[in-house]
Amino acid sequence: MKVGDLVRVRTKHYGSKLGVVIEINEDGIHIKPQKHPRNIIAGAADVVVLVSV
């Protein structure tokens, strides 16, 4: 997984969301969702790569 990958992330309150990885650091994977106003910080177990760049 790397920056720019299209991913599906499983969230606690909003279900599964599609988004793009914008940063990976020790806090987790930062994702910019397509149809949600806030960025998501997720653990690796909650993220599935759909399209790798």
What are the language-model segments listed below?
Residues 2-53:
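Basic/aromatic-rich interaction segments and small domains that mediate binding to polyanionic partners
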